[in-house]
Amino acid sequence: LPPLSYWQAVAANSIEKIYDVNYEPTNRFANNLAELPGQFEKDTAALDALINSFSGNIKKRWGQREVKFAGKSNYVKYIDNYLSRAEVDFQKGLITIETVSPTEPQKHLKNAIITTLLTPDDPANVDLFSSKEIKLEGQPFLYKQVLDQDKKPIQWSWRANRFADYLIANNIKTKDVDFKKAYYVEIPMVEDHFSQRSYQYADIVRRASKKYDIPEDLIYAIIKTESSFNPYAVSWANAYGLMQVVPKTAGRDVFKLVKNKSGQPSPEYLFNPENNIDTGTAYFYILKNRYLREVQHPTSLEYSMISAYNGGTGGVLNTFNRSDRKRAMRDLNSLQPNQVYWALTKKHPNAEARRYLEKVTNFKKEFNSEHTL
């Protein structure tokens, strides 16, 4: 008989031939993640109107080229009637605070620095789509993620004030913005800022894991992939919070199928870390026990769940057969887990979903290596 490697090569070649289809590109909402593209447009209309108004206010102060919004892995907050803003880039680990105030710019910059350092760990009290001031109370969101000039974490007003004075005296920079001068400072985050943020949610993740029988490492990997542990995360897809839950789809499913209630979660509900992690993990429970319950091998099931969280159950099944869902499930179940992984990362109709599964599985490995004694 030929060696085992020969049969492995034949099998791999067969899989490639079976799934070597020129798929048309789709988006995250094309395959069962949203009910209809038209519904998606309707759902995001209010958000679009809000952002259009918001961007108009930004352009008046900063110009067309300097419009910045909060996203999945960056926090952007305007204050001071749009004259000042802060951006926290959670992937780069860098905080940029700047002002274009024409009068007393250093005073305005100091206020923006203090506000940023003391912004509370409560997204419900921070309006990302206005220049509304932030009520500074409770533990700061950036606590232990930023250290002052004495290498101390910043929790209280006196320390934030002192650090702001230090930054303005030593680190202030200027640049031209729309024919105006902007004054800004850059603050590096601590090296382990990812871990510092993840620690904040350890108890919530543990509870959700036990409640829905979804592994902790998977929940952590999803959060890191979706938001970089940014509870303020918001995306063009009308997704909110740590696990980037879309209210109209995953949120509505969880309310109906798990919580036995009508309607869908509000953005405010999903900005709450406890609610968000519970809802996102509950959706994995639905994927596991309802939409993908026929997947037989537990590892193949997990790969399918991860892919479906991003690209919908339909996207998973279309990877194996575009016209016959029952046959798609049979084909999926005929493969070994590594072959299912190969198909979902090479032949899924959505490029984003292909990359997504790779990212999540890599972050899972990273999490487990960090937590192995």
Question: Model segments located where?
Answer:
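Catalytic and binding regions of secreted/periplasmic enzymes and modules that target cell-wall glycans
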Residues: 276-326
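Secretory-pathway/luminal and periplasmic proteins that interact with or process carbohydrate-rich
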Residues: 227-236, 252, 311-323
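Substrate-binding/active-site groove segments that recognize
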Residues: 236-264, 278-286, 332-335, 360
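Short, functionally critical alpha-helical segments immediately adjacent to catalytic or ligand/cofactor-binding
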Residues: 213-234, 245-246, 280-281, 305-310, ...
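Active-site-proximal structural scaffolding
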Residues: 235-238, 298, 353
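Cell-wall glycan-active module
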Residues: 1-224, 289, 293-296, 322-373
